Design a protein with these regions (language model features):
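Conserved acetyl-CoA-binding loop-helix of GNAT-fold acetyltransferases
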Residues: 101-104, 110-123, 127, 146-150
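Conserved beta-strand-loop-alpha-helix junction that forms the acyl-donor binding cleft
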Residues: 135-143
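Glycine-centered small-residue hotspots that permit tight backbone geometry or close packing
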Residues: 97-103, 147, 153-161
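Conserved catalytic-core motifs of GNAT/GCN5-like acyltransferases
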Residues: 136-137, 152-168
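Glycine-/small-residue-rich active-site loops that bind phosphorylated ligands and cofactors
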Residues: 77, 92, 109-110, 140
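GNAT-family acyltransferases
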Residues: 1-99, 124, 163-175
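A short, internal acetyl-CoA/4′-phosphopantetheine-binding micro-motif in the GNAT/acyltransferase core
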Residues: 72, 86, 99-110, 138
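Conserved GNAT acetyl-CoA-binding A-motif
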Residues: 125-136
Length: 175
């Protein structure tokens, strides 16, 4: 069973294992929220995962309040991915970023974990009264587009930024 959890001292070794796998693969670690600081220092890393409303307000629109969750496979006691939920959108996130950033660790891809993880993130968005939810992916990232579509994503448009085409989807979380 999968569930979204916050980082704690107890599950920190699971994070280190996941981040080391990602680093060894040489792939970009996604979502960006989990690569902002060095994960090898628990206290510094933990404090970098959440941006409060007050901190976001002080940034004069450059940053938004967010929450970071790790996806725990409780049957295997394994972090299989992570999601970052942005509580609002600034101009940059409106065009390229969206409310949810998500990533599945390399060894766990192709198993439907992304679809389940996004479903759990959407439930959290509903709890936070975020609706509709914007999700964005590269046009070339077919698995991510499928994950969004399986979770009710409706394609609004495609936009190009810095030579990359991004697909923008909206998902209603409220009845």
């Amino acid at each position: 069973m999968l569930k979204l959890v916050k980082l704690s001292r107890e599950n920190y070794p699971l994070l280190v294992e996941m981040m080391e796998e990602w680093t060894e693969c040489g792939e970009e670690i996604i979502p960006a929220a989990i690569r902002k600081t060095d994960y090898r220092n628990y206290e510094v890393y933990r404090s970098s995962l959440e941006l409060s409303k007050e901190e976001a307000d002080r940034s004069e629109g450059r940053l938004v309040e967010d929450s970071t969750f790790f996806c725990l496979d409780t049957d295997r006691n394994l972090f299989v991915g992570a999601v970052s939920i942005r509580h609002s959108l600034n101009q940059g996130l409106l065009w390229n970023g969206g409310h949810i950033g998500d990533g599945v660790r390399p060894s766990e891809r192709g198993r439907g974990i992304g679809t389940q993880m996004v479903r759990l993130a959407l439930l959290e968005c509903k709890r936070l009264n975020i609706s509709p939810v914007l999700m964005v992916c590269r046009k070339t990232n077919i698995p991510s587009a499928r994950t969004i579509e399986k979770n009710g994503g409706v394609l609004e448009n495609e936009v190009e930024k810095d030579g990359i085409t991004w697909k923008r989807y909206w998902i209603n979380t409220l009845p």
